[in-house]
Structure formats: C-alpha cells, structure tokens
Amino acid sequence: MLWAAGYLCLSQAQIAPPPDYDQKLSGVTVNATRSDTPLDQIPLNTTILTKEVLELAPDQTIDQILKNQPGVFLNDQPYYEKDPTGQSLNVRGLGNARTLVLADGSPLNDAFYGTIMWNLVPLSSIDTVEFIRGGISSLWGNWGMGGVINMNTRTPKNSQQEVSANYGTFNTVNLAVSKDIMASDNMQLRLSADYLNTGGYTNIATISPAAANSIKPGMGAAAAENSNVRLQSYFKAGTDTKGFVRVGYGTMADYSNAMSIATNLKQTTDIAAGTTTKLSEGDKVLVNLFYQKTAFNKQNGSNAAVSSVFNAQKLATNTPYISSNYYDPYSTTGAGVQYIKDMKGLVDQVLVGVDGRNISGSNLTNNLTTTGAVSSVNYAQGQQNFYGVMGQAKSTTSFIPLQTTLALRIDNWSSSTPIYYNTGPEGKNASYQNISNQNKTILSPNLGFLYELSKEWNLRSSIYQAYHAPGLNNTLRSYASSSGGNNFANPNLTVEIMKGFEAGTDYRWKEGFLQLTAFTNQVTNAITTYNLKANNATDVALAQQLCGAAKGSNPLKAAAGNCVSTSINYYTNNQNLQSQGLEMQFHHNVSPQWAVDAGYSLTNTILTASSTSDPTGSQVAGVPQNIGNLGVTWFPVPKASITTTMRYVGNSWMDTAHTLPVPAYAIFGLRANYEINQSITLYATAVNMLNRQYITFGSGSNNSSYVLGMPQAFTVGGKFTF
C-alpha cells in the first residue's frame, strides 16, 4: 500500500496519484503542529496519509493501516477483536498509553484507560492522518512521549450524500452513511452514522509455542458491534472568524476476552468545538474545547477450578462463570486558547497558549464466586487536573538556511483520590485508605533544527523532554481473579518523564522521497505492576493495609483479611527504560503506472532499572526489534489500481524474562479499486492473503496468553456518492 506518502485532494475522485504529488505534499500544513507548519519544515519525523492513500490499503480499520508506519507497534489484530481495555498504541517501543491520538485536534485517548477509541472514527470519515513521532509534550502536554497522531475528518461538500458499505469474512458488515447540507454561505453541516458488526474469529492461539489446550470451555469467536452518530457544523461568524462544532455518540459491545458469557458495553458522548479568528495579516487566535463522557460496563469470565476459593458452587473444573463485573463512569473536559503571530526579522513566528483539562471517574469492581455471590468489592473515585502554559518561537537565519524551533511548556498536574476502599464478602469489612493528594510541576522543552542542504534535501534534529501521567486505571481500578490473585491500584503514582533526541534527513525528488531517522529516549519513573514479596517488611505492611488484615499477619504467605490469594500485585513507578532505534520510509513512482513503497524500523527497548522481577538489559515484552513493509501499486488505467503489500515482523518475546518466544512472521495483503464513474467506486481486499497461521506479538505471563494473528479475510465493498 502507499504509506508514508500522500497528495493533495482533487475536486473529483481519482485512483491514480497526480504528477509530482510528493513535492506538492511537502507544503501541506500539518495541524498537529498547532502552528500551521508545512510538512517540510518540521524537525521531527513526520508522515501524512491522505484519504486517497488510505483507500489503497488492504486493511479495513485505521489502526491496522497505522501499524504499517515505521515506529508503530500495533499487532495484527483489528481493534474490535481486542478487549476495550487493550486497544492501546505503542510508538517507538515506549509502551502503551504514551502516545497522543486526536480527531480534529480533540483527544481520542480514553480518559480512564489511556487506550485509543478507534471505534469513534471509522475509516470512511477520515480525510487525512498526520503522524509526528517523538516527544511533543511541549505542545500537547500529557501522553506526549511517543508523538501525536491527528485524524482530520471529512468536511461538508456540495450538499452531497455518500454511502460506504462492505461485507467480508466472519460475517463482517461495515456500513457508513453521510449527508452534507450547505445551509448557507456561512453554515455547512454534515450528519453521519456508521455501524460495524462482526462474528469475529477465535483469537486464542493453540499453535506452537502456545499451549494446545489454551481454549477453555466458554471461549470462542470475538464477536463485536460498534455504532456511531455524529453531527458536524462548520460556520463563519463574520469575515474574520470561522469555527466548528462536533457532537457524537458511540457504542461498542463485544465479548470480554472471547468469553461468550461475559460482555462489554462502552457508551461515549463526544462534544468538541473551536474557533479561529484572524486579528490581522499574520495574527490569529484559536479557541477550542471538548467534553467526553463514558459509561463502561464490563464483565470478566473465568473457568472454575475445584480448589479455588471462588468455586463455592463446586463446579467442575473449567466450567465457565462470570468472575467479576465492573462499572466505570468517567468524563473529561478541556479547553484552550492560543495566539499565533507571524513576524519578520530574527523571529519568524511566535505561538503562546494556555489550556486546562479535568479527568474524573470511578471504578466499582464486584469480584464474584461461581454462585454469583460477591467475594469482595473494590471501589475508588478520583480526578486529575492538568493546567499548562506554552510558548514557541521559530527563526530562520538569512546567512545559512537553518530553521530553529524552540518550544517550552509548563504543566501543573494534580491528582486526588478521596475514596479508596476494598471489602470482604458482600461488601463487608471495608478497608479504607487515606490517600494524599499528588501535585507536580512539569517542564517540557523542545529544541529543533532543520537545515536545508538543497530544495530537495534537508537535515533535521530535535532534543526534547516529555511526560505521561498515570491513568485512572492505574490509580483507581482494583480487582481480584482466581488466576491472577489480587491486583490493586496505586493512587500514589507520579508522572513518568522522558528525555529524548533524534536526528534525521528527508530527501524528496520529483518521483518520491526517502526519510531516515535515528532516535534515543530515556524514561524514568516508568509505571509497571509489582508483585509484593512475602520476605519484604515494607511489602508485608502494604499488603496488610490493602487487605485490611490484622497486624502480625502476612497476607503474602496465607490469605488474610479481604484478599483471596497470597498473590498481590501493585502498580509502581520503580522502572526506568531506554528505547533506541532507526526508522526508514521510502516511496518512488517507478512510472505513471507503478509505485513502490518500503518501510523499516529497528527498535531496541530495554529496562535500565527495575524493582520487579523483569530483568534489565533485555528487549522488553511486546516490542519486536525488526519490522518491515513493502508495497507495490499498479495503475493499469487512471481509474483502477491494484496494491499488494508484505509485512514482516521479526522475533519477539511475550515476557521480558524471555521465556515465551514469539516467532517471526510475514503476511501479504491485496487490494483492487475500480472507479466506475465519479459517483461509484468498487473495491475488493484480502488480508493475510496466503492464510498463514501465526501468533502475533504482544505481552503475557504464560503460554496460554498467546494471540492468533488475523486469519485470511476477504472484503468486497463500494462507495457511492450522489
């Protein structure tokens, strides 16, 4: 597929790219920079994917298209086949929930879990995707370690209607409709809705090195159902102000961890608005705000064990039952103002801004026995606040073609957890924790250089500091299970800090481009889970407090208080990690009929310090060192295209101790497009075209945790505009 490339949208549908589109793309403004910076002036490794490029990809969800971007670690499993708590994004091996994802400048990161709400932005609604790698906390604050991905959605056009529909393997149905309304010269509306339903596939692996008996009774295909409705309004308020308002509601339902008796339901209301006011030539003010409210009802299923304390009904071993249910209501509200002034002289542009955000939520967990009785309850309620001030200046010297960008942001982060308790059976014997408020001021600088060797060739480098605050799932969500013991949230967690440097080059010629980037990142206070030790006095005291156990007891040697097991896990900041690597993106138009794309990433991510059992100096779990892509597109006629892709993922490990290997694999994809006329385009795709059976990368604790990669899947569909 054509990736790491894009081109300007034309006035009518077009399958083949226009001439010199790589050169034209270089001047496209990247909204994720917050400063109207053209692509060829960004000192960080940056990619733009346009709608036309997205439509050449065999994959049918935006997460699976992004997995082919160098530096992205998303396994070969569509988001809807994953539990909502596992729909994460890892960039440059830095770990999940450390990269910011936006839709039209508003966050798509789940406010509680930090995962990505891919379901709220179906592929049919996306116009372009901007991807800036590297530390960007200087502009965006939290989640700014791995970079930022901004999806620009489609805007109203000519009062048209559009229907996109496809059907594929596993009875997967995807339907999207939209209606554009040109209400007046100053008001345009877009009303859209989409629906996805799939029978899914059984993604629990039983091929080597997975355990052959990993699929237990009650486990099956990961069926899922998503739906969204959205109303977008774009308006002009006078000659100098334009703005937008977006209101949406989305649902996502699936089986929890492929257990057909356990269901998940996530319901999200999403509101965003913004204005841009031109004060004078080169001066403007931007105002934006957003609000999201989510209700997440989740069940977990387990298989009974005769010896388990949860098996009060004495069910036969492996009999499925609901082992817990959760209710997580949460919301986030944010707003910001920024001022941009273009200047002449020593400084070319100045940006200043201020913003704030609140995240509030709670978690109620009922841990259940096989009879449905409540064995214990975990509850916590809390909030986090972020307030930031930022500034950025750009300067280009006249005597040498060097552009310098200096950005600085100061954030104040606070966290409060007024209620945190764990109970015994039926909610009795509650053990309350008194939690001190957390408060930290964080400095996020970024200094970037871009040197123009020629019109086609530049060198770039950037040094930065970024941060990531603990998620509410780390500070509020506690639970127990028959297999994993007691897992407690830690409301005393603090922020992670990353220091990084990268250097690269971009070379663009008439028929293509080549981008090369080297990076190094150091993360301190990295959040991880820690298994409390029975011979550690500090751990024993903490276990007594969490379990509500009597002094003198040791819940880590014998179950005591409200704890159902001697296995007690707790989140901690006691890890440091290092991520270093290389990224390469290449595109070349061999002829008007042929185009070639290639990409490669080499990523070495290790722990440099750890208080857990994870060893230092070893490649961390879920991060393959080598990932490569190759794509070839043929345009037999201007209205048709055939794209074939190859994705290679090298050897990796499910655990950092390197006891659970994940073998390397390569898979192939295919897509054919044909534009019948300006109103009708048909397509057919194949994912895993050769039907390879393979285990995709991830993390886990035993050989029953392996995940099967996407099996062979065919899709046929069309887009109809009228």
Model-derived features with residue positions:
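C-terminal beta-signal and adjacent terminal beta-strands/loops
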Residues: 467, 519-525, 529-531, 648-655, ...
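Gram-negative outer-membrane beta-barrel transporters
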Residues: 396-404, 412, 519-522, 531-534, ...
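Face-selective signature of the C-terminal outer-membrane beta-barrel domain
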Residues: 234-250, 267-427, 434, 450-452, ...
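Extracytoplasmic beta-strand/coil segments of soluble accessory domains associated
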Residues: 63, 67-106
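Outer-membrane beta-barrel signature, preferentially recognizing the C-terminal barrel domain
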Residues: 263-278, 328-330, 378-384, 434-444, ...
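Short acidic/polar hinge/loop motifs at secondary-structure boundaries
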Residues: 89-90, 106-133
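N-terminal Sec signal peptide and the immediately downstream disordered periplasmic leader
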Residues: 1-59, 63-67, 181
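Periplasmic-side early beta-strands and strand-to-turn transitions of outer-membrane beta-barrels
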Residues: 150, 158-159, 166, 172, ...
